[in-house]
Amino acid sequence: MPIHDKSPRPQEFAAVDLGSNSFHMVIARVVDGAMQIIGRLKQRVHLADGLGPDNMLSEEAMTRGLNCLSLFAERLQGFSPASVCIVGTHTLRQALNATDFLKRAEKVIPYPIEIISGNEEARLIFMGVEHTQPEKGRKLVIDIGGGSTELVIGENFEPILVESRRMGCVSFAQLYFPGGVINKENFQRARMAAAQKLETLTWQFRIQGWNVAMGASGTIKAAHEVLMEMGEKDGIITPERLEKLVKEVLRHRNFASLSLPGLSEERKTVFVPGLAILCGVFDALAIRELRLSDGALREGVLYEMEGRFRHQDVRSRTASSLANQYHIDSEQARRVLDTTMQMYEQWREQQPKLAHPQLEALLRWAAMLHEVGLNINHSGLHRHSAYILQNSDLPGFNQEQQLMMATLVRYHRKAIKLDDLPRFTLFKKKQFLPLIQLLRLGVLLNNQRQATTTPPTLTLITDDSHWTLRFPHDWFSQNALVLLDLEKEQEYWEGVAGWRLKIEEESTPEIAA
């Protein structure tokens, strides 16, 4: 048997989930096409405890989070940025000063943090369960986190219903169990509040139905483990077993005195509010039994990353679906895309340090989807399109990616005010401003909506934000309208500090070789 194995080292991935209660990291490698978990790390951070009534994250909570990220960074040494995905969930969605935390995190861990929407979180949780559980058929997946609860019905890796509600074991502890006091009234109020938050989706979920219900969170895992210790060896959660558990919990007066078999010390402060939410979910959806799933958000993120390496990007499906939904003129979208990317490739050659693969992909989708707002009105098209892109549920896109796509589309025509641009943490201005310029030119050069008016050759020369666009010899004699549009565009550029657009024609016709 040879001592040295010459087979290539398996690709390793890391997914980090910045939850409201705990930060989790899971590391995996792909062996023969299968994902193999090789390490897990979890730190209780209590981020949501530091979120005040003004939705500002306290300095203490930020410090706890940054200390944990520093620990994770040690384990991630040597990982390429493409192999690490860090997602922020409910508390970072809510915190008005989340940007401050993200900027400080950049100095601690050299990987971008993506804040994802509640629905995107729910979709990824479902994918994590679907990839790791052997059960077939339609699944109901529930995840009760520190700040939000996600519910999904789906089948064969396709989510059908996706919902996220602002109720979690940390936020409910503060709202319904002040001082950690446990009594029947507090518990009932929390249980009713949870059921009430699901009122609007109850019938939708019941009508869809499911073959198996799966739970994927710390709360559900804790309930499962306590029930096992209480003699329910299969660990399945049923309404009857939940009532038995509630009865046991109500024997205690406060979180500090809570003593249940199988319940860890660190779980004490959030178990009771989490249990109340679980009871409310059971009540609202009439769940008969719930099984524990090993997979959750971070596993979903891992499989999503691995899929992108195999070019199975869910975002492409999302973009195609949106294009179909809004009846986009696919030929025009393709013309704009081709012209924009023709110029992008020239810009990238001249400015390689500013090129960003993720931004390139977002530019492509923005070019394809810049006319989604036509269904509302042609007047203000750029604003309507941006609104749709920013406010639609777009599976696969994190919040910043979605906002970036909306921003590119919002400024693809008319005047530009740089002061109105949103702030981004994942992308720098010098990286994305050229993409706005490229998309503007790509759209403008296809205003006639005919392939015949697109120049056969186009040369772009860039010097910072001073651009020269060179057209074939005598091309404008046949395309006077395009020249008028370009002259108007030059005026828009002059209104932006530092931007200049020069238009030229080749001095002599190109001679074919």
Swiss-Prot record:
One Pfam entry name: Ppx-GppA_III
GO biological process, one term: polyphosphate catabolic process
Superkingdom of the organism of origin: Bacteria
Impact upon substituting E150A: Almost loss of activity
Gene disruption: observed consequences: Deletion mutant accumulates polyP.
Entry annotated with the keyword Hydrolase: yes
Signal peptide as annotated in the record: none
Statement: the UniProt record of this protein carries the keyword Hydrolase: yes
E.C. no: 3.6.1.11
Cofactor(s) it depends on: Mg(2+)
UniProt-recorded Gene Ontology molecular function terms: exopolyphosphatase activity; guanosine tetraphosphate binding; identical protein binding; protein homodimerization activity
The entry's keywords: Cell membrane, Hydrolase, Magnesium, Membrane
GO cellular component, one term: plasma membrane
Regulation: Activity is redox-regulated. Highly sensitive to inactivation by oxidation. Strongly stimulated by potassium salts.
NCBIfam families to which the protein is assigned, alphabetical: exo_poly_only, PRK10854.1
Family under the similarity heading: Belongs to the GppA/Ppx family.
Self-association and partners: Homodimer.
Protein name (Swiss-Prot/TrEMBL): Exopolyphosphatase
Taxonomic lineage of the native organism: Bacteria, Pseudomonadati, Pseudomonadota, Gammaproteobacteria, Enterobacterales
Gene: ppx
